[in-house]
Amino acid sequence: MAQRKKIALIGAGQIGGTLALLAGQKELGDVVLVDIMEGVAKGKALDLQETRGVGKWDVDVTGGGTTDYSVIRDADVCIVTAGVPRKPGMSREDLLKVNLDAITKVAHGIKQYAPNAFVIVITNPLDSMVYAMYKVTGFPKNRVVGMAGVLDTARFQYFVGDAAGVSPQDVQAMVLGGHGDDMVPLLRYSSVAGVPLTRLLDKAKLDAIVERTRKGGGEIVALLGTGSAFYAPAASAIAMAESYLRDKKRVLPCSALLEGQYGVKGLFVGVPVVIGAGGVERVLELELNDDERAMLQRSVDSVKKSVAETKL
């Protein structure tokens, strides 16, 4: 019998716990939750194990602490949420100094015990944290990716669907750039079941949707008061992991290393990529007009500034 895949979730907070539940329900593979608070990881793992009977799914969920990364040994996928979440008043950039140390330690653990893993980074500020993961692990560019664009696009899909009175599932959308206030929702490449957005919504509504998408994470932070979004980020990362583990070759907007595409070199920026068994198998380059290129360049400049602060 074929051996089940193994998914390591590093960080057992709100996103980590939701990731574990979704991975279990989809039976993507056995799950190991790892956290600096070992009891939290083990407690959530046990809670999830006790869900299997009623949920009708059969993969194991175990927990462990960050004092012993050997529990992630030979993981096929590592999804990293370690670090602190945004708090009200904090920008993603404020998080950099706090979370860089955590990511560096995690990267060393992954490099030692899961050297062949496909690594998905969720920790913010995303584009600099995924860059740090790439530099510290030394993994090839196709095996390190950041979860940003899938989430940003999902938010855009919901806002469009809500405004147009249609299912978000029928909204085709694309968001480029960094995971921050300078992200670039591409209206020209977005539609509802093939119908251009401009046929369904006026410019004022579309402009408001673009702005709300850019501020989407902050909106939830303000409402929660004690943390940041976790359901949609977890679902977005699971879509990426599933495409890799099941070789689905989905086209997903992710933070990937660019080597000349879109005029960018040596940075992780949100672009459409194909994710399959080879990891990030290719970057799809869209034709941009002058306005879109200018917006993307502003986003890239923000990413460049954030990455420079890592000093890696």
Curated annotation (Swiss-Prot):
Cite the binding residues for NAD(+): 11-16, 35, 99, 122-124
- Alphabetical list of Pfam families matching this protein: Ldh_1_C, Ldh_1_N
Q: Where along this sequence does the record place binding of substrate? A: 86, 92, 124, 155
Q: What's the top EC group for this one?
A: oxidoreductase
> What are the positions of the active site?
179 (proton acceptor)
Protein name in the entry? Malate dehydrogenase 1
What is the reaction catalyzed?
A: (S)-malate + NAD(+) = oxaloacetate + NADH + H(+)
Which HAMAP family is this protein grouped with? Malate_dehydrog_3 (MF_00487)
Tell me which EC number(s) this protein carries. 1.1.1.37
Primary role: Catalyzes the reversible oxidation of malate to oxaloacetate.
Q: Which Gene3D superfamilies match?
A: Lactate dehydrogenase/glycoside hydrolase, family 4, C-terminal, NAD(P)-binding Rossmann-like Domain
Q: Which GO terms describe its biological process?
A: lactate metabolic process; tricarboxylic acid cycle
- What protein family does this chain belong to? Belongs to the LDH/MDH superfamily. MDH type 3 family.
Can you name one GO molecular function term for this protein? L-lactate dehydrogenase activity
Keyword annotations: NAD, Oxidoreductase, Tricarboxylic acid cycle
What is the native source organism of this protein?
Anaeromyxobacter dehalogenans (strain 2CP-C)
**Highest taxon of source:** Bacteria
| SUPFAM superfamilies (UniProt xref) | LDH C-terminal domain-like, NAD(P)-binding Rossmann-fold domains
